[in-house]
Amino acid sequence: MFMFSPEGKFLFQIGKNGRGPEEYLTIDDVCLSQDARELWILGGCEIVKYSTETGRFIRKTTLELPEICNGFDAIASGPGHSAFLYYCPQMDENNFSEDFYCLYRYDEQGRILQKFLPRKDYGLNIALITQTSDNRYILRPQDSDNICYYLSDSLPVPRVKIDFGKETIKNR
């Protein structure tokens, strides 16, 4: 991961790939902290944080995982250094025998604070969370839902409802 100025000048490297305490093993997604002073790298069950001003390592947090989850697909920063993490479970009919949530809010120590968006159907984990130019995050509609959510507050806030009327593809 590399940091460049708005003019395209190379500034510094941010972290490196590896198994060390200041390294990331994989990059599943990235986001900026709400104050944009930190870059957060999501790699499976860990968040590795680096300074956007110097590229220096800040901390690595191992996440407490829900029972069915084996790693997360997307990340967005939340208030007070919390993080929203999204998980799209594998397609398995047995997954619907128990309640399961797709969106979790974590504290800085990796503990679950809140759960949102009970899963209603199978989802595609493509472009789940989009960052806006003002460092807000938008979660695209999930499963059989037709709402886009902002993730900039402590709760997902419904922002846009998509309704194609009679042209909508029917749910199962």
What would you call each of these model-derived segments?
Residues S5-K9, S51-G55, Y106-Q109, L151-L155:
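Short loop/turn segments that connect beta-strands within beta-propeller blades
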